[in-house]
Amino acid sequence: EDTESLHTITVEYRSPSSDWSTTDLSTLWHNSATSRWETNFTPPTTAELGEYDIRIQVDDTDEDSSGWSTYSDVLEVLNNGPLVTSYTPSETELYRTTSIRLQAGVSDTEDSASSMSITLQYRSESGDWATDYLSTSYFNSSSGRWESNFTPASTAELGDYDIRLSVTDTDSSTSTWYT
């Protein structure tokens, strides 16, 4: 019969709600070191999330065919999680009832920074995480960063404060806390 490298292999995939396709597959090649056919699946950032099916068909030089062999839910396309890329306070010291601006840079493979949202919290040396002294966060399109004002009350505890933030993308994936 035919040597493996002479077979014609067809590989297709199917997302949870579409038809069979080859669009996001690389050209197939025969890996002689492992004696198998290989392809790369590279879904775009707009690819549907979920489990994908794969089907394979082998044809030989005599035009005989194996027919389709289908494998269900063998690939899972996941959302890339968002990241906090930077955090910058406008000042590192302030007085009670005065404000400093907190800026945060965020990124995500699928979403623009402006389409995401951030969660900011602070705590004093003896306190719990809170948000009372923070203004509503907003995206500053001029700087390309998220911003909020930190304004401690006249009764705020003196000392150092920790600030932490996370970012949530449009698929509801949330980064780890950045402190």
Question: Positions of the model-derived regions?
Answer:
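Proline-centered linker/hinge motifs at extracellular inter-domain junctions
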Residues: P82-L83
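Terminal edge beta-strands and adjacent linker/stalk segments
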Residues: S65-L78, S173-T179
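Solvent-exposed serine/threonine-rich low-complexity stretches and specific carbohydrate-binding patches
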Residues: S21-A33, A130-S141
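Short, solvent-exposed loop/linker segments at the N-terminal edge
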Residues: T92-T98
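Short glycine/proline/serine/threonine-rich loop/turn segments at secondary-structure transition edges
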Residues: T45-D53, A113, S154-D162
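Aromatic sugar-binding surface patches on proteins
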Residues: N31-F41, N140-F150
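Extracellular acidic, Ser/Thr/Pro-rich low-complexity tracts
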Residues: E1-T3, S15, D60-D62, A104-D111, ...
